[in-house]
Structures are given as structure tokens and as C-alpha cells.
Design a protein with these regions (language model features):
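Hydrophobic anchor at the beta1->P-loop junction of P-loop NTPases
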Residues: 35-37
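Phosphate-binding P-loop
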Residues: 26-32
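Conserved nucleotide-sensing/catalytic segment adjacent to the nucleotide-binding pocket
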Residues: 66-115
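P-loop (Walker A) phosphate-binding loop of NTP-binding proteins
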Residues: 40
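N-terminal pre-Walker A segment at the start of P-loop NTPase domains
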Residues: 2-24
């Protein structure tokens, strides 16, 4: 049974807000942490992932583009600490391809960011940060982020979401 520990909806987020949420999250991520990013094409999933990875690039004074793994499925970054793996399952067509990727090994050795996690089917991890991007181009291009902690026990992650909620509520 999957336990939803905590959740919150951040409404009307622009790209600067999304980047700030990603930057704050980057400060607490450790090997074994998994982020599942859901949402339609163009909602900001890749942008969010790049913002997180870029924060670590800055720490290590790495100045290079962060490509989307849309065609390669996986992009790893083992030149930073913690090591990152960015997975984009959009183009994956068969569940048998998941076995070839070796996600269990990736989960144990990297901070893992997965776009289009719906394609994981029954292979979803037991614990993860679920971030759903809700994008409405018909209403002033509004973007909402729904963040849920699924099976998470990390006090740092709970504190991150609690602090984020508090700061957000003070702004509205």
C-alpha cells in the first residue's frame, strides 16, 4: 500500500517560481531520492529537472548545457555529487524496455528524476516525491504544481515541503 504522507498545491506558478522551488529542493536531495514529474507536454517538467541539476553544476563550477533525455531516455551526471540520473520515458513504447534501463540500480546509486512516470506501470518505486505540473494555456497560461510525498520518511524532505508551504501561504 502506498502512503501519501503530505501534499500541497502551489497555484499560479510562473517559471521563476518553478525555478525557485527546484533550487530549494536541490539543497536537500541525496542519493536514493526519486522525483516523479507528471504533466502534459510543455508544462515545465524538463525545465524543473534542469533547474535542479543546474544548481549542482554551479556548485562544481560546471558551465554546460543540460540536455533533455527525450531521445536517449537516460542522461546521467556522475561528475557532480550527489550523482544524478534524469530519465524521460515519453518515447518509451514497451514496458520490457524498463528492464533494459535497470531502474533499481539507478534508484540506489543516483538522485533520480523521471519524466512521464505513468509509463513505469507497476515498476513505480515505493517512495518518491511526486510533482504534478498542471498547465492551463486557456487561462492565462496558469501553471500549478501539486507536490505529494509518497512513502517518504526523510525529515529533511518533510521540512522542505513544510517550509515551502509556509512561505507560499505568506505570499498569498
Amino acid at each position: 500500500m502506498t502512503l501519501i504522507s503530505e501534499k500541497f498545491l502551489f497555484k499560479n506558478q510562473n517559471s521563476s517560481d518553478v525555478a525557485l522551488i527546484a533550487q530549494r529542493l536541490s539543497k536537500i536531495l541525496e542519493i536514493g531520492d526519486i522525483l516523479l514529474l507528471k504533466g502534459p507536454v510543455g508544462a515545465g517538467k524538463s525545465f524543473f529537472a534542469r533547474c535542479i541539476i543546474n544548481e549542482f553544476f554551479k556548485k562544481f563550477k560546471i558551465y554546460e548545457d543540460i540536455p533533455s533525455p527525450s531521445f536517449s531516455l537516460i542522461q546521467t551526471y556522475d561528475n557532480i555529487k550527489p550523482k544524478f540520473c534524469h530519465v524521460d520515458l515519453y518515447r518509451m513504447s514497451f514496458s520490457s524496455e524498463l528492464e533494459e534501463i535497470g531502474l533499481d540500480n539507478i534508484y540506489e546509486n543516483f538522485v533520480t528524476i523521471i519524466e512521464w512516470p505513468e509509463r513505469l506501470g507497476t515498476k513505480k518505486p515505493n517512495r518518491y516525491i511526486n510533482i504534478k505540473f498542471i498547465y492551463d494555456k486557456n487561462v492565462n497560461y496558469e501553471r500549478h504544481l501539486k507536490i505529494s510525498l509518497i512513502g517518504i520518511e526523510s525529515k529533511k524532505i518533510f521540512k522542505w515541503l513544510k517550509d515551502l508551504k509556509k512561505d507560499y501561504e505568506e505570499l498569498i
